[in-house]
Amino acid sequence: MVSLFVIGCIFINLGGKLLVEHFQLPLWMDSFGTVVAAYVLGPVCGAVVGASLNISYGLLFSYTQMIYGLINIAIGIIIGICAKKGYLDYLFGVLSVSFFVTLMSASAGTVLSYAFFDGALDNIWADGVCTFLEHIGCNMILSHV
């Protein structure tokens, strides 16, 4: 039963990623399944689900996206640990953990994008906002965060 749940969470991640790519949405929806798996089954399963998405997507569509699996792994670990410690049992904890995960994801994504893709985000909305911010005079690194 657990294995079916994990596979379902991987498909939730894959569906979110494909939906965003198809409709060119300004969102990253490839970690919903990671969060659900980490919350229900713990940090190890959350990390496995997060890594599985990026590995499978990389093998099927674009191997360059595999590096972002590190972010999904971190999301799974953070959510899983916070759920086990009870931080997600009350609103302030949920908001605090959400803020931390968002900050970590944006920071790590920026570092990985610069390290491997010269800052390109492969999302039309995100690249447009970054270009606009650079055009009006924002620092290049700050505009990507």
Give residue ranges: language-model regions.
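Membrane-embedded alpha-helical hairpins and interfacial helices in multi-pass inner-membrane proteins
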Residues: 17-28, 66-67, 87-145
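Hydrophobic transmembrane alpha-helices
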Residues: 1-40, 44-55
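Alpha-helical transmembrane segments and their immediate interhelical/interface regions
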Residues: 54-93
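Alpha-helical transmembrane segments of multipass membrane proteins
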Residues: 9-16, 49, 53, 57, ...
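Hydrophobic alpha-helical transmembrane segments
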Residues: 2-7, 47-51, 66-70, 91-100
